[in-house]
Amino acid sequence: MEITYDKEADAMYIEFRKGKFSKNKKIDDFTIIDLDEKENILGIEFLDVSKRIPLESLKEINLKNLI
């Protein structure tokens, strides 16, 4: 898993797996899911992140109980 933030685009992307992109699904005006050919989720893009999440909170991300 990889989380990236593009300051210029004000977009955050959470990549769950590598794979060949096939299509995306728009969830709302700020959330897009990328899918592979079998409709497995490759990642999720969040737009206008700074308007929805305090950027200070992106500096420290804790991952707990993933496995």
Residue ranges and their predicted role:
Residues M1-I67:
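Small, basic N-terminal interaction modules of short regulatory proteins
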